[in-house]
Amino acid sequence: INGDAVYMTSAGVDHVPTGLDPKKAMIERSVPKKVFKDAMLAWEMNGVPLPNAHGGPLRMVTPGYFGINNVKHLGKVAFTKEQSSVKYMKKSYRISPIGKKGSQYPSCWEMPVKSWITRPTDETGTVKAGKVQIVGVAMGGTKKVRSVKVSVDGGGSWKKAKFIGPNLGKYAWRQFVLETTLSAGTYN
């Protein structure tokens, strides 16, 4: 890797239709070069060649980063000083306030911490009174999930949940559970 490189830039070999500017149509993404140590090249899925629909024959996988950085139909990887100048890098896939140009904001790279509560609720969203297990999953983007806290009073107080199941590494979802007593009703 070039010592002064700042980015790992991956380019897909998608066919650009005649008449379109390749800089506006091709998929090429630059991510910080630190991604390289955990990035993977995928050419198989479940023991068979990676299908075209999933980016085959070769796909870049950047764990902990938004999916747009997992370039499909990979044709080139380069280590560069500058980010790619194609449209999908310079202007697209950015989180910006409504009415603001995306190009003024950083590209979507690292995923934020994410979590979901998966139970206890029925189809109506109502919880029955009594002892319950609040179960969910959490993922830390590019960081290891070290703990999960759950609030049952809209953020007024927090209780530490326990991890259940195996720890499959910092990029994997972690399942958690909190045993508590609740009144009947709906909770956010």
Annotate the PLM regions.
Residues 2-188:
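Extended, aromatic/histidine-rich regions of cofactor-dependent oxidoreductases associated
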